[in-house]
Curated annotation (Swiss-Prot):
The chain crosses the membrane at residues 9-29, 67-87, 97-117. The accessory proteins ExbB and ExbD seem to form a complex with TonB. The lineage of its organism: Bacteria, Pseudomonadati, Aquificota, Aquificia, Aquificales. This is Biopolymer transport protein ExbB. PANTHER family: BIOPOLYMER TRANSPORT PROTEIN EXBB, PROTEIN TOLQ. NCBIfam families: exbB2.
Amino acid sequence: MMEEIKELIDYGIMGTLLFMSFVALAVGIERYLSIRSTKVENFKSKAQLEKELTKRLYIIATVASNAPYVGLLGTVLGILLTFYIIGEKGIVNTKEIMVGLALALKATALGLIVAIPSTILYNFLVRKVREKLLDWEAIHGECSSSHE
């Protein structure tokens, strides 16, 4: 059973986090290219423009907000594995404890490594959306009611 938990951490948790990072990166690149090439003058309505510019940004935000939790799940499983080994053997084997804790910390670190750049990417793209909306307002003579 403990071997399955170790494999779940190594392949399940780490694989999920790597998949999440690739999804965030792919969506981020696609959104950046789309936002950059969007011609604001082609939109009669600001709402239509905003809808077009913000497509799929929620995916990046979801990855950014959930990656730490996936990493935390790996941490909990790694610590569970460590305690199980200690309890089952009745003696403290430093090597096995360190391997279990290293596995736990690896999951936490990878969760943060995925979350932090995803958050930065999301905020960058939201800023680009705001710039395009301001360009639309300038062209159409509308003033934004909120100033940031």
